[in-house]
């Protein structure tokens, strides 16, 4: 609810009471094709994003100055200033509407830090949606998407959710039909991987012509498998051009991938730039079994069971007054 601070004649004079909480999902790349290094330092990407039920909670409330607090595993390693994408999202949204970014942001982390699941991008998307709601701005979805794309390649998908085909740097999205709920086991590694370092390692490996590094095929079979809803069909088609680079930098991930398949997963893949490994399972009970076995295998820090696709960044309804 908005109440006028003075005569309410301008948007900046309206103050909103309370707070807004947004849930936003992590992602798994079911397919990731990485083009050669461009002159601008980026790579053209074609990817199939898949939002999974591993959710960060972003709460925004009005304050005297912009501040950011994060809680959850690994949160202490994250900067709580302009180096953080969530902070920059608040500044960008405020600039877009001509206001000061005077909000207090609290993020409860469940998506692993530096895990290849776009947790930082998810938090930035959560801030955009939360501020739009808290300040009752009515910024349309297409404009939120444009702001998200300014922040980073993975931020638009965190808004979009579901399953989507991404192109360009990953920010150009087309919705993909997925006829089933797919069940995943996510294995979090003992340490993170820097996305720029993984891309750099891929460039280095590709420059070594003696390696003959394989590349993913076209994405159409993956899209067909999603439309069919058959997890076994999809499992055979999972592919990630960044996986060899992630394995080169973090060889222990090979043990994790092997252990997950030996535990009964249909297939395993490094998610994005890693080091989180995502295992597709035949069913929800199968995922629980795989998760239990993988937990005891000693090959990763933490195991989570998740499903997808799920919605993108969305406001959590406030509890109704009794």
UniProtKB/Swiss-Prot annotation:
Keywords: ATP-binding, Isoprene biosynthesis, Kinase, Nucleotide-binding, Transferase
Pathway in which this enzyme or protein is active: Isoprenoid biosynthesis; isopentenyl diphosphate biosynthesis via DXP pathway; isopentenyl diphosphate from 1-deoxy-D-xylulose 5-phosphate: step 3/6
Lineage start: Bacteria, Bacillati, Actinomycetota, Actinomycetes, Mycobacteriales
Binding site for ATP: 112-122
Family to which the UniProt record says this protein belongs: Belongs to the GHMP kinase family. IspE subfamily.
Catalytic activity: 4-CDP-2-C-methyl-D-erythritol + ATP = 4-CDP-2-C-methyl-D-erythritol 2-phosphate + ADP + H(+)
Cited Pfam families: GHMP_kinases_C (PF08544), GHMP_kinases_N (PF00288)
Function field: Catalyzes the phosphorylation of the position 2 hydroxy group of 4-diphosphocytidyl-2C-methyl-D-erythritol.
Protein name stated in the entry: 4-diphosphocytidyl-2-C-methyl-D-erythritol kinase
GO molecular function, one term: ATP binding
EC number annotated for this UniProt entry: 2.7.1.148
InterPro entries for the chain: GHMP_kinase_C_dom, GHMP_kinase_C_sf, GHMP_kinase_N_dom, IspE, Ribosomal_Su5_D2-typ_SF, Ribsml_uS5_D2-typ_fold_subgr
Keyword Kinase carried by entry: yes
Enzyme active site: 27, 154
Encoding gene (name): ispE
Family annotation (NCBIfam families): ispE, PRK03188.1
GO BP annotations listed: isopentenyl diphosphate biosynthetic process, methylerythritol 4-phosphate pathway; terpenoid biosynthetic process
Organism of provenance: Mycolicibacterium smegmatis (strain ATCC 700084 / mc(2)155)
Signal peptide as annotated in the record: none
SUPFAM superfamilies per record: GHMP Kinase, C-terminal domain, Ribosomal protein S5 domain 2-like
Keyword hit for Nucleotide-binding: yes
